[in-house]
Amino acid sequence: MRTLVILPTYNEILNIETMLRTLREVIPSVDVLVVDDASPDGTEKRAQALSEELGQIHVLSRPVKSGLGGAYRAGFTWGLEHDFELFVEIDCDFSHDPRALPSMLVAAITHEVVIGSRYIRGGVIPRWSLSRKLLSRGGNQYANVMLGLRVADSTSGYRVYSKSALEKIHYQSVTADGYGFQIEMTHRARRGGATIIEVPISFTDRAHGESKMSRAIVLEALWLVTKWAVERPLQLRNP
C-alpha cells in the first residue's frame, strides 16, 4: 500500500536531515511529507534541498505556526488528494525511533489504526523520572476510563492510520491539539468502529531542540477528556 510519513516541523534544523536520511534508509519505498510551520531556523529550506537529493520527499509550507493537530490534518488531506493509503504520524526529534516503523506497517496490514505504545509489554521509556511516568500513565488511564478507549497509550504520537480509518474518524473536524489531538483521534476511531492495535515502542526524549508541548496543551487534553466523557452518555442515548 502507498504509504506517506507525515513529519510536522517547527525549528527542527538540528534533526531534519538525520531523520529524513534515516527514514529513507529504513524504508526506502515510503514517501515523506514535511509539514513546516514557517520555521525561522531554515528547516523548510533544508527539507527542500533534501527532497531534491533523496527523492519522494515533499514539503508542505504553512504560513504560521498552527499546532500539531493542524499539521496532521493538512498532511492527511494532502495525502488523500495524492492517493496514499497509509498515513504515518511520527515526531521529527527522534523521540519515536524510525526503525520501529516496519513492524508497525506490518500490523497495519490487518488493522486500521496502529499505535506505537509505551505502556504495553515491551514498551519502554528510558531516562524518564518515576514522577513523569506516573503522571503520563495516570493521564492515559483517566482518558481510558472516562472514554472507554481500551488502549494503553492514547496520547502516543507514533501511529499509522489507514485511509478507511481517517474516513471513520472524520479527521477534518478534529479540533484538539497536542495530547488532546491524539486522544480525540483515538476516541473517534473507537466510536467509528475502526480496528485498533498497539505495538511496543521505545520512547526517548529529544536530544536536540526544544519540546513543543506546553502546560496549556496538557490542560487542554484533560479538559477535553472530561468534556467528551460528559457528552458520551448523551451520544449513546441519541445515536
Language-model segments: what does each one mean?
Residues 12-15, 39, 97:
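Donor nucleotide-sugar binding loop of glycosyltransferases
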Residues 60-81, 86, 98-179, 206-221:
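Acceptor/aglycone-binding surface of glycosyltransferases and processive sugar-polymer synthases
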Residues 36-45, 64, 94:
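A conserved acidic beta->alpha catalytic loop
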Residues 12-26:
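Short, well-formed alpha-helical segments that are part of the catalytic scaffolds
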Residues 17-18, 41-50:
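Acidic helix N-cap motif at the loop->helix transition within catalytic regions
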Residues 7, 29-39, 60-61, 90:
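Short beta-strand/loop segment that forms part of the nucleotide-sugar
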Residues 2-3, 24-34, 42, 56-57:
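Short loop->beta transition adjacent to catalytic acidic/histidine clusters or analogous donor-positioning motifs
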Residues 1, 146-149, 171-239:
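Hydrophobic helical membrane-anchoring modules
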